[in-house]
């Protein structure tokens, strides 16, 4: 199945909870630091955030990072120093390349509904590029019960482009008992956003059950499959090469 596989349970993640934010961090982030958990492959941040209605992150700065946001519920209002204003909804792929430096805010514009999103940071393959922003809707493709490219450094059609040739983010919304093949790669990060899945080797001799919030980190992975439970599932898979 893989030379190495490590299962990370959702409850083991770092946790930040304040009046307007409930955030779970897969890797070291902010005040949460573990030198043994600084990321996986090229993925440095995998934050699972619930932002209360009318709240959010005020203007703050980033540089030399590829930032991908995936909304699960609600809407996100993005504003940045490039003059971009975007509303990101479920089914939208959004990428901000921080490059030489950019400031932005991320707000839940609703007065009644909480916002649930995943934000992921990936190292760029080139530092000092011009900052940029891209947003695309891929909702129709997600109905196919397949892995759909959401953010890609390899020119996948329909995906936002990231400045990292060794990384592709795939998303699948699986119906009950739906199944997809996990890409083989030096580093593969599987995160379950909703529902639950079985991660199994091709011969089905090895199997793990992953619930919402759980992740699997596969190193030098061989062929494996994700199969949704009866409730279905939404999974995000980072396929990554060598740094």
Which sequence ranges carry the predicted segments?
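Jelly-roll (double-stranded beta-helix
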Residues: 1-243
């Amino acid at each position: 199945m893989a030379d190495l596989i490590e299962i990370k349970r959702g409850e083991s993640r770092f946790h930040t909870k304040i009046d307007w934010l409930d955030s779970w961090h897969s890797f070291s982030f902010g005040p949460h630091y573990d030198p043994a958990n600084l990321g996986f492959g090229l993925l440095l941040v995998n934050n699972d955030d619930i932002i209360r209605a009318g709240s959010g992150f005020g203007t703050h700065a980033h540089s030399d990072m590829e930032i991908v946001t995936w909304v699960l519920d609600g809407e996100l209002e993005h504003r940045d120093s490039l003059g971009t204003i975007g509303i990101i909804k479920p089914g939208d792929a959004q990428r901000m390349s921080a490059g030489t430096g950019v400031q932005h805010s991320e707000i839940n514009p609703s007065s009644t509904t909480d916002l649930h999103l995943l934000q992921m940071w990936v190292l760029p393959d080139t530092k000092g590029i011009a900052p940029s922003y891209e947003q695309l809707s891929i909702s129709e493709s997600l109905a196919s019960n397949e892995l759909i490219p959401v953010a890609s450094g390899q020119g996948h059609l329909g995906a936002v482009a990231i400045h990292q040739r060794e990384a592709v983010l795939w998303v699948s919304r699986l119906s009950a008992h739906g199944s997809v093949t996990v890409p083989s790669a030096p580093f593969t990060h599987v995160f379950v956003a909703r529902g639950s899945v079985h991660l199994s080797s091709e011969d089905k001799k090895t199997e793990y059950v992953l619930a919402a919030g759980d992740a699997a980190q596969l190193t030098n992975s061989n062929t494996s499959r994700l199969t949704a439970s009866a409730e279905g599932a939404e999974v995000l898979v980072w396929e990554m090469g060598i740094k």
